[in-house]
């Protein structure tokens, strides 16, 4: 595989953006408590438009206190402010929104600091009703301290189109059984994995029947009581519990055949693996986890251990993996991540036939990440000293229905005060029939990249308002096709794309640790 480098003139890019901006729709302010539909009186030739905006709740959990570190986390504030570790966001964060038939399901944590319950809302687009279930479980906080919020403890969500069951995995960050001498001080003994699921057909029940009674209680020997809806394994077999230990970042996908797939990261930041499993809708049972790559790679002959920062995705009919590596080698030039790595499986369940981007067989489970490396973003900064290159934010990837492969990433100097400081955003893409990747730095950067049909999209917030940029798959020709200009301002959100629509699940800007959540449904003007 070769790599081509391209750089378009910045003036050309600005000119295109300005022309597009002239034609943008100016949206009416959206302040209603319930679902509303918004239209534009200005022609939008892109076909991108906001279908509706719906308030889901007035009080979702948000961390509004101080950011703590390893020196301060044992002394959090006992006042109303909610101190946190890592990031502020835990609601409208992660794998938290999924459409199913004429419903949209959303997970969140209840605010404020003293509440923290796991919540599940269902928006019925036919009746306009938002019905919410409150679960007994409360966010446990960083390493089990409820006074320290933990942004990694997101709630993964799925609905099976084959039997209407609802599945949630939540509130964990590499938790394990340990004792008072361990990292978690014995706080997660037989409670290190949290899985809740419903009876068959629960996703379809009438609004007044969408209640906690649709979910299955844990009646095993490890049950924590009559109101325990948490299950320690997804298989239903407690003998499998070690297979569900030390996991983080739940994410669900639905295959083209309606099968549910689920993956998580096993291990830690610089020594981890992607584990995935599958739901058998007929028997209503999940498989054990299967590794994409080995953890503890040194024990398998690699020169060093490494972790993954990216995602496993089921997209365009295949299970795929794209990530950046965080090496346990602390003496190289990379402070955190490096590289762009990618693989896909020709097996419908990912159980073999794994290949690199060129279609060549790779070792499975993977040990040496170089087998699937595409390029090195760190080469775009001329630093060689240990830990001088900083790669953390702005990485994502997607594959269009035409099989165009796209990666975005961001690299900068670790020392922001050095005289030769450099910062670069990169877009690497390979059209379906191309042999080589094109890599361009004529890219403004983004947190995520999405696809629908043969198009690619960058969707995010600008000054608190949603925007959409669109380009044809296999190109870098992004144009702004949608920009909200008024209404509710948002702090952050998470997005799910399905059937040509973006389900943008958003938290409203505000003060305190209990803030409103909204759902925007944006038609992307794509026929799938």
Swiss-Prot record:
Binding residues for Ca(2+) 1: 218, 228, 230
EC number from the UniProt entry: 4.2.2.-
Effect noted on mutating residue 249 to F: Greatly reduces catalytic activity
Residues engaged in binding Ca(2+) 2: 329, 332, 334
Membrane topology: Lipid-anchor
Covalent lipid adducts (S-diacylglycerol cysteine), residues: 30
pH-activity note: Optimum pH is 8.
Positions contributing to substrate binding: 151-152, 309, 326, 390
One Pfam family per UniProt: BNR_4
Location relative to the cell: Secreted; Cell membrane
Resulting phenotype, residue 265 to A: Abolishes catalytic activity
Annotated site, Neutralizes the sugar carboxylate group at subsite +1, chain positions: 265
Lipid tethering residues (N-palmitoyl cysteine): 30
Active-site residue numbers: 152
Molecular function per GO: lyase activity; metal ion binding
Function: Ulvan lyase involved in ulvan degradation. Ulvan is the main polysaccharide component of the Ulvales (green seaweed) cell wall. It is composed of disaccharide building blocks comprising 3-sulfated rhamnose (Rha3S) linked to D-glucuronic acid (GlcA), L-iduronic acid (IduA), or D-xylose (Xyl). Ulvan lyase catalyzes preferentially the endolytic cleavage of the glycosidic bond between Rha3S and the uronic acid GlcA, but not IduA, producing oligosaccharides that have unsaturated 4-deoxy-L-threo-hex-4-enopyranosiduronic acid (deltaUA) at the non-reducing end.
Stated name of the protein: Ulvan lyase, short isoform
């Amino acid at each position: 595989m070769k790599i081509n480098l391209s750089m378009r003139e910045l003036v050309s890019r600005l000119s295109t953006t300005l022309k597009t901006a002239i034609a943008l729709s100016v949206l009416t302010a959206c302040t209603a408590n319930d679902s509303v539909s918004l239209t534009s009186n200005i022609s939008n030739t892109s076909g991108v438009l906001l279908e509706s905006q719906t308030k889901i709740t007035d009080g979702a959990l948000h961390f509004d206190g101080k950011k703590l570190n390893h020196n301060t986390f044992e002394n959090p504030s006992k006042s109303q402010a909610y101190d946190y570790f890592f990031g502020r966001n835990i609601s409208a964060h992660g794998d938290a929104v999924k459409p199913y038939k004429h419903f949209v399901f959303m997970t969140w944590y209840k605010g404020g600091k003293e509440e923290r319950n796991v919540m599940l809302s269902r928006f019925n687009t036919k009746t306009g009703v938002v019905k919410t279930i409150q679960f007994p479980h409360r966010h446990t906080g960083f390493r089990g301290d409820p006074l320290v919020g933990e942004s990694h403890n997101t709630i993964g969500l799925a609905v099976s189109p084959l039997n209407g069951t609802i599945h949630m995995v939540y509130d964990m960050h590499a938790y394990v059984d340990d004792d008072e001498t361990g990292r978690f001080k014995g706080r997660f003994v037989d409670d290190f994995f949290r899985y809740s699921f419903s009876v068959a057909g629960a996703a379809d029940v009438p609004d007044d029947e969408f209640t906690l009674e649709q979910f299955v209680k844990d009646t095993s020997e490890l049950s924590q009581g009559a109101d325990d809806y948490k299950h320690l394994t997804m298989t239903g077999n407690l003998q499998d519990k070690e297979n569900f230990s030390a996991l983080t970042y739940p994410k669900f996908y639905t295959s083209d055949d309606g099968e549910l797939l689920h993956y998580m990261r096993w291990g830690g930041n610089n020594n981890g693996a992607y584990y995935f499993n599958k739901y058998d809708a007929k028997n209503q049972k999940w498989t054990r986890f299967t590794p994409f790559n080995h953890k503890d790679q040194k024990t398998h002959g690699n020169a060093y251990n490494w972790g993954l920062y990216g995602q496993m995705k089921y997209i365009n009919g295949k299970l795929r993996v794209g990530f950046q590596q965080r090496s346990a080698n602390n003496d190289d030039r990379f402070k955190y991540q490096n590289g762009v790595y990618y693989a896909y499986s020709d097996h419908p369940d990912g159980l073999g036939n794994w290949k690199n981007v060129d279609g060549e067989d790779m070792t499975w489970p993977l040990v040496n990440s170089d087998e699937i490396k595409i390029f090195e973003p760190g080469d775009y900064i001329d630093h060689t000293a240990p830990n001088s290159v900083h790669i953390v934010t702005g990485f994502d990837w997607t594959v269009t229905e035409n099989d165009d492969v796209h990666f975005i990433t961001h690299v900068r100097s670790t020392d922001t005060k050095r005289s030769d400081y450099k910062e670069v955003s990169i877009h690497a893409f390979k059209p379906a029939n191309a042999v080589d990747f094109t890599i361009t730095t004529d890219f403004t950067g983004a947190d995520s990249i999405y696809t629908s049909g043969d198009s690619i999209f960058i969707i995010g917030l600008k000054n608190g308002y949603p925007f959409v940029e669109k380009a044809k798959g296999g190109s870098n020709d992004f144009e702004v096709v949608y920009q909200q200009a008024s209404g509710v301002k948002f702090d952050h959100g998470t997005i799910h794309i399905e059937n040509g629509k973006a389900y943008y699940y958003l938290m409203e800007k505000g003060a305190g640790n209990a803030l409103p959540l909204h759902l925007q449904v944006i038609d992307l003007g794509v026929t799938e």
